[in-house]
C-alpha cells in the first residue's frame, strides 16, 4: 500500500521523446523522478488530460492526490473548485517558474504549500527575450521570408529594420529574469535602460550595469527606475514584460496603456499571456501603433487555433514574433527544473520541509513572496 499519490501533469513528447532523452519535461520521461518517488513509497500517476474541468483525468486523479506537479508550459489549472475536491492535497509543485496556474488564495485557505524551482530557467527566458527583441527590431522575419521565397528586395526589409543601439528599452519587472535582460542589453549600447518594479534594485546591481555601460560604451548612468508605468512606456522604443501574473498585472497591457506607448514601439512578453489583453495587442499591431509584438506566453495554454496572436500582423507582415511557450524549457532548463522538483519532493518526503526560501510561494496559509502582488 502506497503512502500517497503524486499526480504529474506534463505535455506529450511523442516521437520527440524517443529521439531526445534529455526531453525531461514531457510525460514520457516524467522529469526522471518516477523511481525516486516510488522508492519513497508513493504512487506516481501521470497524465496529459487536464481539460476540461471537471471531467478530465486531472479532476479524477486529483481527488485523492497528496502532491500535484505541473508545469507553466502545459499548465493544469489548480482552481479553487479543484482544490475543494482534493481533501488530501498538501503540496503543489511547479516544474519551472511561475505558479499563477494555482489559485493561491484557495491554497492559502487550505494551508497547501505551493512551490516552484526559482532560478531554474531565468537565463533561458532572458535569452529568449533578447532573441525576440532582435527578431522584431532587425526585421528578421521579413528577411527570412524573402530568403525562403526566392526573393531579394533589400529595401522591403530595411524599411522596417533598426538597431538596438541608442534606443530606450524598458522592463516591467526587474527580478531574476528582468535584471538578466538588462544585463544583456548593456552590450547593445542603449541610450537608457528603464525599469518598473514594486521595489528598487539594489545600488550594487544598478552600479554594475552603469559601470559596464561606461566601460564598454562610454555612456554611464543609463539605468533608471520609473515609478509610473505610463511614463515609462511613453518614452520606450522597446518594452519587455518580465513580471508575474497576479490580480494587479492581469490585463495590464490593454488598449488604454498601449495608447501611452510610442507609435511604432515594440512589445515583448515572455512573462504570462494574460498580462496583455490579446485583442487589444492584436489591434495595435494591425494598426501600426505597435511595430511588433512577440513572446511565447498565451492567455490560455495550449492556445486555441483561432487565437488572435496566431494571425495578427501589420501591413508588411513582419509584426508577429510569437512562438509556443518554449522560452523557459530549453534542454538545459529542463535538467535544472527536474532536479529542483526532486529536491522539493525530498524536502517533503523527509518531513524536514526545508525548502529553499526562494522556492516557496505560499506556505502555512500565507504568502512567502511579494512577487504575486502580496506582502509577506
Curated annotation (Swiss-Prot):
Protein's organism: Saccharomyces cerevisiae (strain ATCC 204508 / S288c)
Reactions that this protein is recorded to catalyse: formate + NAD(+) = CO2 + NADH
Annotated site, Important for catalytic activity, chain positions: 272, 325
Gene Ontology MF terms in the entry: formate dehydrogenase (NAD+) activity; NAD binding; oxidoreductase activity, acting on the CH-OH group of donors, NAD or NADP as acceptor
Compartment(s): Cytoplasm
Protein name: Formate dehydrogenase 1
Enzyme class: oxidoreductase
InterPro entries: D-isomer_2_OHA_DH_cat_dom, D-isomer_DH_CS, D-isomer_DH_NAD-bd, FDH_NAD-dep, NAD(P)-bd_dom_sf
UniProt cross-references to NCBIfam families, sorted A to Z: PRK07574.1
